[in-house]
Amino acid sequence: DNKHIIWMSERDNWNHLYMYDRSTAQPVHQITRGKWYVREVLRVDEDNRQIYFSANGVQPGEDPYLIRYYRIGFDGKDLVCLTPEEGMHRAWFSGDMNYLVDVYSMVNKAPVTVLRSAEDGKVVMPLETADISRLEAEGWKAPEVFTAKGRDGKTDMWGLIVRPTNFDPNRKYPVIEYIYQGPGDQYVPKTFIPYNWYMTSLAELGFIVVMVDGMGTSFRSREFENVCYKNLKDAGLPDHIAWIKAAGEKYPYMDMDRVGIYGCSAGGQESTT
């Protein structure tokens, strides 16, 4: 209407959408709110006063990095989740915004592709489901999603544990962490990964391989992200250490006397700090 601007900001500690008055540059009201993170605005439907966007962390109790797609009114009411299944979603909308093709998976869940209604997210028709039976027949094991508290004893850190295909719980395994903790992003895989050269190959050599996103990475709260502000040497390492110790306490086959770390680029800096 040329009177308002939709603005994205972390002003309340989480990345959200706000309605601003164009003439005064003052906020009119907050559109989205809660302890979650708006990732991308996909379309602003001015005729129907609706915003289509992606976000992570909306659903309580699940991995806060998993992306889903939503629709909400300009007034902040009637939030609708268009991709209700748990998973990391990637969607493409039709030109008229009536439908979306949604592909979703997790590290331990094979990809599924469906056609959905953009009105309510209901599945119009299934399109494809990946068949991983041959992969499983070869002995493939999915990574484990593991969660533990970080340095503050209260914030969940999310990571992966990758074991060799011939894993024996009665053995002791050296542990190696693949680290990349550069600011401005999040790095632990969230989609289906049948093979990951920097983790799977090492696991097949007889290691337990781990990866975790510590404080200082993106898509959580501003407070979480700002741990690395003017403090790159922190590298989230106190959170990584707490997470690995928690994993070692749960799984005695992880040899806490033989723990290594490696990475490249920012990960190279962090592994040699």
Q: What residue ranges belong to the model's regions?
A:
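Glycine-centered loop/turn positions within well-structured domains
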Residues: N15, Q26, K77, P111, ...
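Residue position within the beta-strands of beta-propeller blades
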Residues: I5-M8, I51-A55, L100-V103
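Short, conserved, GDST-rich strand-edge loop motifs in beta-rich repeat architectures
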Residues: W7, F53-Y65, D185
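A short loop-to-beta-strand structural motif that recurs across blades of beta-propeller domains
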Residues: H16-Y18, R68-Y70, V112-V114
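Serine-hydrolase catalytic core recognition
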Residues: C81-T83, M88-T273
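Short, solvent-exposed loop/turn segments at conserved positions within beta-propeller repeat blades
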Residues: E10-N15, P60-Y65, M106-K109
